[in-house]
C-alpha cells in the first residue's frame, strides 16, 4: 500500500513586504536582492494576534473543503514548523482544535526547512503500515517573528506562509509517494543556521534579548555551499534509485531558499528550467511552507496530471535535507 496526496491547500498573508519596502529599512536595493536571491517580495503576517497555528488552521479548513471531508474523519495531524506559537503545546494540537478533528492525534515535527518532507515521509509510513487512512500534513512558519529586520543578510530572505496536503491510501501501488531519502548532519550543521535563545540552554533574559539571540542567525556562505551540494546529491540519488532520467521528471519541486540554489540543483539534475517550479520571487523562503505551497499552486494551475513524476528536495537547519519521489495519482 502506498500513500497518495488527495488534497492540497495553501495560506499566505495578504500583507506584502517588497524589496522597495526593504530599501526604506535597510542599506539595500531591489537589484542587489534580486541578483543574489531572486526574491522580489514576501508575505508578512502583520496581525500580532495571529501566528503559525492560525495560518496552518486556515490550510486545514481548506483541505477539508477540498476533499469534502468531515473533521472527525482525520486520524492524524502533523505540522512541520520551526516557529510554533508556543514551545508547548504542539501547533498541531491548536490546528486540531481549530478544525474540530476530535478523533485525531496531533504532533509537530521540527526539521526547519526540511520539515515538510520529514513530516510527509512520516505520514506516508503511517498510511503504508495500514495503521491510518486519513492523515493531514501541514508545513508553515511565521518567519517574520524570528527575523532581525536590521540584518540585511537575513531580512531579505524570509516570508510567512503555510500549506499542506491530505494523504490517503493510493488506489494503485504504482502511484503516490514511491521513495524518500532523508538525512541529518548534527556533527557539522548545528552551528551555521540557528536561533540561539528561547530554549532550555538560553532561556529568555534581558541579556539574551539585548544580544539579539532570539533572532535567526545564518552563516550564509557555508549554508549556501551545503544546500547546493546536499539538495543536488539527494535529487541525483532519488533519480538513480528510481531509474529516472531528466526526461522522465515532470517537475522538480525544490525548497525555495533562493533562486541560485534552485538553479544549481536543477543543473546537477540536467533539468530544463521549465521543469523547475519556483515561486521564491513572490514569497521568499517560508521554510517548512515552501514545498507544500509549490504543490498547492501546481495543483491549482492543473499542471499535475495522473502519472506526473515529481521530485521534492529540501535543505534546512540541523543540517537536515532530503528528497521524495511522487508519481501523482
Swiss-Prot record:
Its EC number is 2.3.1.180. GO terms for biological process: fatty acid biosynthetic process; secondary metabolite biosynthetic process. CDD domains: KAS_III. InterPro entries: ACP_syn_III_C, ACP_syn_III_N, FabH, Thiolase-like. It is found in: Cytoplasm. GO terms for molecular function: 3-oxoacyl-[acyl-carrier-protein] synthase activity; beta-ketoacyl-acyl-carrier-protein synthase III activity. Pathway: Lipid metabolism; fatty acid biosynthesis. Pfam families: ACP_syn_III, ACP_syn_III_C. One of its GO terms (cellular component) is cytoplasm. Its main location: cytoplasm. The active site is at residues 113, 255, 285. Residues 256-260 are annotated as: ACP-binding. Keywords: Acyltransferase, Cytoplasm, Fatty acid biosynthesis, Fatty acid metabolism, Lipid biosynthesis, Lipid metabolism, Multifunctional enzyme, Transferase. It catalyses: malonyl-[ACP] + acetyl-CoA + H(+) = 3-oxobutanoyl-[ACP] + CO2 + CoA. Belongs to the thiolase-like superfamily. FabH family. HAMAP family: FabH. The last Arg residue of the ACP-binding site is essential for the weak association between ACP/AcpP and FabH. Homodimer. Catalyzes the condensation reaction of fatty acid synthesis by the addition to an acyl acceptor of two carbons from malonyl-ACP. Catalyzes the first condensation reaction which initiates fatty acid synthesis and may therefore play a role in governing the total rate of fatty acid production. Possesses both acetoacetyl-ACP synthase and acetyl transacylase activities. Its substrate specificity determines the biosynthesis of branched-chain and/or straight-chain of fatty acids. This is Beta-ketoacyl-[acyl-carrier-protein] synthase III. It comes from Chlorobium phaeobacteroides (strain DSM 266 / SMG 266 / 2430). The gene is fabH.
Amino acid at each position: 500500500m502506498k500513500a497518495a496526496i488527495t488534497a492540497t491547500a495553501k495560506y499566505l498573508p495578504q500583507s506584502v513586504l517588497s524589496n522597495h519596502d526593504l530599501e526604506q529599512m535597510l542599506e539595500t536595493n531591489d537589484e542587489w536582492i534580486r541578483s543574489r536571491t531572486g526574491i522580489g517580495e514576501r508575505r508578512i503576517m502583520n496581525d500580532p494576534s495571529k501566528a503559525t497555528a492560525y495560518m496552518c488552521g486556515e490550510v486545514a479548513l481548506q483541505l477539508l473543503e477540498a476533499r469534502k471531508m468531515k473533521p472527525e474523519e482525520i486520524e492524524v495531524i502533523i505540522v512541520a514548523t520551526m516557529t510554533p506559537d508556543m514551545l508547548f503545546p504542539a501547533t498541531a494540537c491548536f490546528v486540531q482544535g481549530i478544525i474540530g478533528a476530535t478523533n485525531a492525534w496531533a504532533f509537530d515535527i521540527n526539521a526547519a526547512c526540511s520539515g515538510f518532507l520529514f513530516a510527509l515521509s512520516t505520514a506516508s509510513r503511517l498510511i503504508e503500515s495500514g495503521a491510518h487512512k486519513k492523515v493531514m500534513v501541514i508545513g508553515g512558519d511565521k518567519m517574520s517573528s524570528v527575523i532581525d529586520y536590521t540584518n540585511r543578510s537575513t531580512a531579505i530572505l524570509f516570508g510567512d506562509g503555510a500549506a499542506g496536503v491530505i494523504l490517503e491510501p493510493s488506489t494503485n501501488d504504482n502511484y503516490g509517494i514511491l521513495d524518500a531519502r532523508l538525512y541529518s548532519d548534527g556533527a557539522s550543521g548545528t552551528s551555521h543556521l540557528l536561533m540561539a535563545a528561547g530554549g532550555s540552554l538560553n532561556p529568555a533574559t534581558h541579556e539574551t534579548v539585548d544580544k539579539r539571540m532570539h533572532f535567526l542567525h545564518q552563516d550564509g556562505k557555508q549554508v549556501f555551499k551545503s544546500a547546493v551540494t546536499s539538495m543536488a546529491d539527494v535529487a541525483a540519488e532519488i533519480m538513480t534509485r528510481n531509474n529516472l532520467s531528466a526526461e522522465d521528471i515532470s517537475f522538480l519541486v525544490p525548497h525555495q531558499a533562493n533562486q541560485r540554489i534552485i538553479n544549481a540543483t536543477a543543473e546537477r539534475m540536467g533539468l530544463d528550467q521549465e521543469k523547475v517550479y519556483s515561486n521564491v520571487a513572490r514569497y521568499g523562503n517560508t521554510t517548512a511552507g515552501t514545498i507544500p505551497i509549490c504543490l498547492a499552486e501546481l495543483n491549482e494551475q492543473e499542471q499535475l496530471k495522473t502519472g506526473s513524476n515529481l521530485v521534492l528536495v529540501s535543505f534546512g537547519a540541523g543540517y537536515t535535507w532530503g528528497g521524495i519521489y511522487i508519481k501523482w495519482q
